[in-house]
Amino acid sequence: MSGNGGAATTAEENGSMMRVIRVGTRKSQLARIQTDTVVAMLKTLYPGIQFEIIAMSTTGDKILDTALSKIGEKSLFTKELENALEKNEVDLVVHSLKDVPTILPPGFTIGAICKRENPCDAVVFHPKFIGKTLETLPEKSAVGTSSLRRVAQLQRKFPHLEFKSIRGNLNTRLRKLDEQLEFSAIILAVAGLQRMGWQNRVGQILHPEECMYAVGQGALAVEVRAKDQDILDLVGVLHDPETLLRCIAERAFLRHLEGGCSVPVAVHTVMKDGQLYLTGGVWSLDGSDSMQETMQATIQVPVQQEDGPEDDPQLVGITARNIPRGAQLAAENLGISLASLLLNKGAKNILDVARQLNDVR
């Protein structure tokens, strides 16, 4: 049984009782692939445990006619999964980290952040525009994305293009692109395309100097009940130290800015030679006003260690007792410091105006 009498049960296999751990996921194909990836890692580590996957729809999956930034909820893709966790219907849930708010509801924590894949965005072109780039698309070409972050950065660089909202899962968006004439291209996360096996559709990768990425993009997170020590220990070994530290810095930056999907905020992190570099930016909705800065902190990528004290508080919703606390705090401080620098330079005005304009659109 799990540490707090949770959903973990036992099942009989070959005459012996196997522990069963229930894993919650969204129903989309990409979410299932991501969950299967995490479960495969856990099965390798724990061959004596049976993992049962339970799929469910979330608010973000159900409301498909409205841009995410307009729906007005912060837990669009996590709330229903957290409800199942709270009711002990599942023991852990797998998310894209970029969907997980920087402040989690009481009683929950991110127990693992897996090794990050490419965090950048990619452009997928309509078949008749294959071989083009955003720069060489014809005047007034429509480019599909529902991300304020992408639009704010790209509208300024490519004023000849028209950016239009497009919702739905990856399959739906690609179908809209290929079968209708509305869009010349759409913008998606590289990691999602790779996980779906659609690398061949990537027509252009947008590097951070062209378009910085979302906080946590490209990383998978495992959310658990905060007091379920047994499950925390079980999943904690999946923490990738470098990814963890980069994402703590990114999430601390976003939290201190009080950002979310209703304002254009983007980041870029690099770990090199014992230094963690964090670049963060904020934009007005049309990209005409922006502010970016870079800061760095000395942080050696640690190896995993024996678990630290059990009463360690979470950092930006994350519990990682097997990663040295000092490194985590240094990453968090870096994010807070960069956000403070931007706020002191007037970033709050940019974000406030962006919020107000987004509310009235």
From Swiss-Prot:
Pathway: Porphyrin-containing compound metabolism; protoporphyrin-IX biosynthesis; coproporphyrinogen-III from 5-aminolevulinate: step 2/4
Textual note on the cofactor: Binds 1 dipyrromethane group covalently.
Enzyme Commission numbers on file: 2.5.1.61
Modified-residue entries (N-acetylserine), positions: 2
A GO term for molecular function: amine binding
Location of S-(dipyrrolylmethanemethyl)cysteine modifications: 261
GO process annotations (BP): animal organ regeneration; astrocyte differentiation; cellular response to amine stimulus; cellular response to antibiotic; cellular response to arsenic-containing substance; cellular response to cytokine stimulus; cellular response to dexamethasone stimulus; cellular response to lead ion
Compartment(s) of residence: Cytoplasm, Cytosol
Family: Belongs to the HMBS family.
NCBIfam families, A to Z: hemC
Protein name: Porphobilinogen deaminase
Lineage of the organism: Eukaryota, Metazoa, Chordata, Craniata, Vertebrata
Gene that this polypeptide is encoded by: Hmbs
